[in-house]
Curated annotation (Swiss-Prot):
Disulfide bonds: none annotated. This is Altered inheritance of mitochondria protein 11. It comes from Kluyveromyces lactis (strain ATCC 8585 / CBS 2359 / DSM 70799 / NBRC 1267 / NRRL Y-1140 / WM37) (Yeast). Keywords: Membrane, Transmembrane, Transmembrane helix. The keyword Transmembrane helix applies.
Amino acid sequence: MSEVASVTDAQIEKFSLLYKERRKVQMMRFFGVTALTLISARLAFKGVASRKYIPTMFQLNHKPPPFSYKGEVVNALAYGTALSTGGFAMLGFGLCWIWDVSTLKELGNKLKELMGDGSEKDKLVSTNMDLDEDTQKVADALEAMLSTKK
């Protein structure tokens, strides 16, 4: 029971603050990428809408407006790259935010687990991870609390 008393509310609050800060960073990354994707989508839409040919009273309705082929290619490449990169970044950061993943190894393990890879060697198990002193105290205290309630 002395192990339970060794974990103070301040230590638990510290880990809670670290967790909240990590989740906030994940959220801000997702919303930042979302904002950039929406801005690039708006620019692409305006670029397409500005090229629409609307003839006036006595102009031909099938005459294409003059434009630069190089400029069109550069604009299309830039808009396409921005939209696809933004979409994939939103997918990646959104999954990391939803699954509470902080590292690429955690993300890889989560994806393997979802796809049915049953190998146990890559799973993150708390007994295999090196814990710092404060985390070890909290883990020991929680294990002691759970074992005394049986």
